[in-house]
Structure formats: structure tokens, C-alpha cells
Amino acid sequence: MSKSENLYAQAQQLIPGGVNSPVRAFNGVGGVPLFIERANGAYLYDADGKAYIDYVGSWGPMVLGHNHPAIRNAVIDAAERGLSFGAPTEMEVKMAALVTELVPTMDMVRMVNSGTEATMSAIRLARGFTHRDKIIKFEGCYHGHADCLLVKAGSGALTLGQPNSPGVPADFAKHTLTCTYNDLASVRAAFEQYPQEIACIIVEPVAGNMNCVPPLPDFLPGLRALCDEFDALLIIDEVMTGFRVALAGAQAHYGVEPDLTCLGKIIGGGMPVGAFGGRREVMEALAPGGPVYQAGTLSGNPIAMAAGFACLTEVAQPGTHATLTELTNQLADGLLAAAKAENIPLVVNHVGGMFGLFFTDAASVTRYADVIRCDVERFKRFFHLMLAEGVYLAPSAFEAGFMSLAHGQAEIQHTIDAARRSFAKL
């Protein structure tokens, strides 16, 4: 029995499902999850000492690679001054200044502890600001595990086959209207049915929780126009795409200005951090200055702020996103060529530093219905073949992959060669 197998057996007796977040359990691919001992650069090292080229990146935060010295040193330095104060710090102000500088649509920002907290709080704020109850989200998109958002969710909810989670009261879910991603007609129909009741749209600008599905050219601008027409707020959930697709996020890449933006993952450099922010007049409705309540004991934690500030400072260096995009392009092109050489039908979607693999005969994958028609069983086999080759992909056909600046030509070439051998065995 490997150490991972032994640890998993112990964990299953102590932790529900043996993991602290469902997708880690390998339910989407079968087998025993890897238990990780350490990570550095582009590599993970499991409890048995085996190294893997990592394309999960802690589900997105590790854009600089694992254990980056600037972030590590910032955390050590901050920890020497104390772990948590429950009071404001200078680093919170510096972090807020940096975030609002890098993301120009954010006049003000509030720090929280996770992406779920960010989206949950942004929706509460939108409802409070507009005095409306209903929200629009999109089929296959995931915005955290708040009750109002677990309605036809993506991510682990798709992997588990439970797009509507038990425990979500029908009275909560009835205020969440689910539309089709990349389909403006479905959104207009929702607004026309409830013209004075919809507080906001929340959208992943690149749907990264049904693998990786970029927006069609007119989709995000169309959402902006509909929100303006019906006096609703547009919330762009950049928890995954923020600082990864472009420095100012996917909203800058696609040229769309939201009313509110949600951030997470990269903003913490590997520490638990989320944030939401946007137009000043909307943000000023938050407590303590306004009536919409939001709070958190560990929000703005000094260790997390130090890690995030160090990470964003590095990410903001010139050329970062051009390099990240070029590395992702090389990987995508290589995987497509390898699949074609072995007559394996494959679609690779990619934008910035994220990508998705779809085993399908379709010419493109642009919405949830396309995603669920892909060959999940073939992905499962491919995942384990690649794992045996020392390449760690997301353990679910419904999760995006992530490139980091620590990935070099050697890692990309190894991945492409491993894929060619794996495709040959499918």
C-alpha cells in the first residue's frame, strides 16, 4: 500500500469523503487521490516521493509556480510580527491600493477569506443596492457554495452529478434564474419575464468550472447592455480569471466594465483570500458606512495580505501575461498535434494562462450542453495515463487546467510527449 493509499484510508475515517473539498477525492476519475508532501516551481511531490508536473496549481492561485521565494519570504516576515490582530493594518491599505490600481473598474475593495465569501457578499450587496431579490447565473458556472448559487452549478457539483445540492431550500433557489452561457436570448427572456425584479447577473467571464469555455465575442458586451437596459448590476466573477487571463482580468481582455468584481485565488498568492469591489456608489452601501452587512473575523489577515501583495507585485511585472499566454499556446498546440497524430478527436480551449481539454468530435465547445456531451470515460483513462507519466491534470473532466510562469520548455515538451504516448493507448 502506498503512503497516499494509507493516508486516504485514515482520512476517510476522520473527514467526510476523506477530503476537505470534494473534487480532490478523485471521484471524477476514479482511484486514490494523491497526498502531497511539498511543491516547488512547476512540480508537486507526493507522500511517496514521486514528482509530477502540475497543471492544477492549487486550482489557480499558483500563477508564479509553487513556493515562490518572494511570497514565501513575505509570509515569513509577516508571521514574525504576528498572525492575526482583528484590527486594521497598513498592509490592508497597501493591498487595497494595489488591487484598485491594477483593476481600474474597482473604485473600492473589501477583503474577505475566500471566493465563496466574495461572490456571496457581492450578491447581497447587489440585492441591497437595487432593492431586488432575483439574480441571474449561468448553467454550468460555479461561484462558490453559497445556497443561492448552488443552482445548476459547475465545478465539483457537476463532477458529483448533483447540480442542485440537497440542503438548499426551494425558497432560496427560486430567486436564482439560470440561463444558458453564451446565449443572450435566454438572458433577455429572463429580464422580460421579471423586468423589475432582477438585482444582478453574476458570470464567469471565462467559464472555468465546466472545464474552460471562453465567451463568444458578443456575450459579455451583451450582458452589460442588458444590465443597463433593465437597471441591474453586472457582477463579473474573476476568482479564477483575475490576474491570469490578463493583468486587469478577463474584463480587460474582453473590454467589458462590470459594476462589481469578485476576486480570489491569485490575489492571495496561495493563502486563503477573496475580495470584491467595484463602483464607489455601490460599495459605499456596505457596512459600516451603509446598510448592507458584511463582516469577517479574519478578513484582511496580515499573513494573507502580505502573500497577496507579494504575488500581485510579481504578477504586475512587464511581460508576465504575454509569457503566460505563449506557454499556454505552446501546450495547447502540442496537445492538439499529438491527439491528431493518434486520431483522437480533441478540442482544446484556452485563454491567457488557463486551458481545457475536451474529448469530442464537435468542432467547438461553447456552452454547457457541449461540455456534457464530451467523452468523460476517455478523459478518465487519459488522466490516469498522464498521471503515470508524471503529469498531474485536474482530476475531473469539468475543471480547467492552469499554466504557471514556472513551467518551462522542458516541462511543456515532457507533457506533450506524455500525451502522445497516452493518446496512443486510448
Curated annotation (Swiss-Prot):
Keyword Cytoplasm: yes
GO molecular function, one term: pyridoxal phosphate binding
Pfam family, one: Aminotran_3
EC number: 5.4.3.8
Major subcellular location class: cytoplasm
Annotated metabolic or biological route of this protein: Porphyrin-containing compound metabolism; protoporphyrin-IX biosynthesis; 5-aminolevulinate from L-glutamyl-tRNA(Glu): step 2/2
Keywords of the record: Cytoplasm, Isomerase, Porphyrin biosynthesis, Pyridoxal phosphate
Domain of life where this protein originates: Bacteria
InterPro entries hit by this protein: 4pyrrol_synth_GluAld_NH2Trfase (IPR004639), Aminotrans_3 (IPR005814), Aminotrans_3_PPA_site (IPR049704), PyrdxlP-dep_Trfase (IPR015424), PyrdxlP-dep_Trfase_major (IPR015421), PyrdxlP-dep_Trfase_small (IPR015422)
Top-level EC class: isomerase
Modified residues (N6-(pyridoxal phosphate)lysine): K265
Catalytic function, reaction form: (S)-4-amino-5-oxopentanoate = 5-aminolevulinate
Cofactor: pyridoxal 5'-phosphate
The UniProt record lists the keyword Cell inner membrane: no
PROSITE patterns in the cross-refs: AA_TRANSFER_CLASS_3
Subcellular location: Cytoplasm
One CC-aspect GO term: cytoplasm
Swiss-Prot/TrEMBL GO biological process terms: protoporphyrinogen IX biosynthetic process
Quaternary structure, from the entry: Homodimer.
HAMAP family according to UniProt: HemL_aminotrans_3
Similarity annotation: Belongs to the class-III pyridoxal-phosphate-dependent aminotransferase family. HemL subfamily.
Protein name, UniProt field: Glutamate-1-semialdehyde 2,1-aminomutase
Species of the source: Erwinia tasmaniensis (strain DSM 17950 / CFBP 7177 / CIP 109463 / NCPPB 4357 / Et1/99)
Lineage: Bacteria, Pseudomonadati, Pseudomonadota, Gammaproteobacteria, Enterobacterales
